[in-house]
Amino acid sequence: MEVLAKHRFARTSAQKARLVADQIRGLPVSKALEILTFSPKKAAVLVKKVLDSAIANAEHNEGADIDELRVGAVFVDEGPTMKRIMPRAKGRADRIMKRTSHITVVVADR
């Protein structure tokens, strides 16, 4: 049994979120939550929320035992980019790219 949860349009770049996602792939959920709780990265908070949601989905919808769950797959895809203008000297302008990402966590029983 596999259960997934998604956070779409997360306000962090996919590159930064993948650093966190790579740390928890394949781990038991208790160990993954421990790693995410003590990680100093902003993306760790976002990934932890998605993991908590996936665990709750597995428990509520499938009746799964939390102690038996593992992080099956974690992937982070790029979302749309918001483009902003930063005025510069001599009438020029630079683009500011506000990147978003789609975080998906799949938990499965052993």
From Swiss-Prot:
Pfam families: Ribosomal_L22 (PF00237). InterPro entries: Ribosomal_uL22 (IPR001063), Ribosomal_uL22_bac/chlpt-type (IPR005727), Ribosomal_uL22_bac/org-type (IPR047867), Ribosomal_uL22_CS (IPR018260), Ribosomal_uL22_sf (IPR036394). Coiled coil: none annotated. The keyword rRNA-binding applies. One of its GO terms (cellular component) is cytosolic large ribosomal subunit. Keywords: Ribonucleoprotein, Ribosomal protein, RNA-binding, rRNA-binding. The keyword Zinc-finger does not apply. CDD domains: Ribosomal_L22. GO terms for biological process: translation. GO terms for molecular function: rRNA binding; structural constituent of ribosome. This protein binds specifically to 23S rRNA; its binding is stimulated by other ribosomal proteins, e.g. L4, L17, and L20. It is important during the early stages of 50S assembly. It makes multiple contacts with different domains of the 23S rRNA in the assembled 50S subunit and ribosome. Belongs to the universal ribosomal protein uL22 family. Part of the 50S ribosomal subunit. This is Large ribosomal subunit protein uL22. The gene is rplV.
